[in-house]
Amino acid sequence: MAIIGILGTPYNTVERSPFWWNKVSYTRQSFIDVFQELGHTVIVLPVDKTENIKNYLPLVDKIVLTGGVDVSPYLYGEEPHAQLGTTDPIRDRFELAAIKAALEANKPILGVCRGLQLLNVYFGGTLYQDLSLTSSQIKHLQSPTPQEVPTHHISVEKEDSFRFLPENYMVNSFHHQVIKDLGQGLQA
């Protein structure tokens, strides 16, 4: 089975919260669990200096980009909208470097939530900085529905590298940003 490198999420701390004095990279246990249940080994890769991705990439067969804070609109040529949430330029730079390195090494990439949005931006796409700027009929914010309850359907095109994913299933969503213009070579 494969070794999956999940790019960590920085824990942006505030004083008096756990770890406030240290930077922490983490991932949700559910990401680890799902890949382990499928027989894969998981390594969580810390957000680091962009030049260090070359040291991590040889350790994994595939990478996963997870959710988190908003993708900076500067990356797709827009000014911040009033509804833009927190961004993380260090994470943006590191994950963009990871995408570039993985593509150059022909390693598959799975983008989930923010990860998918960043992949779109990498390929020249843009985002709606907030759902209020689009007419989407999909419920992207779950409240008051519990987080673990799926609320909408998705379909996944079968690719050899991620054939373990089902073709059709339901997912939950916590987005307030969505794809506006699809990146070059991507399919919706």
From Swiss-Prot:
Entry keyword set:
Glutamine amidotransferase, Transferase
Provide any one GO MF term from the record.
gamma-glutamyl-gamma-aminobutyrate hydrolase activity
Cellular-component GO terms for this entry: cytosol
- Superkingdom: Bacteria
PROSITE patterns in the cross-refs: GATASE_TYPE_1
InterPro entries, alphabetically?
Answer: Class_I_gatase-like, Peptidase_C26, PuuD-like
Q: Name one GO biological process term.
A: polyamine catabolic process
Q: Which Pfam families match?
A: Peptidase_C26 (PF07722)
Q: Indicate the segments forming the Glutamine amidotransferase type-1 domain, all copies.
A: 17-188
Q: What is this protein called?
A: Putative glutamine amidotransferase-like protein YvdE homolog
Species of the source: Lactococcus lactis subsp. cremoris (Streptococcus cremoris)
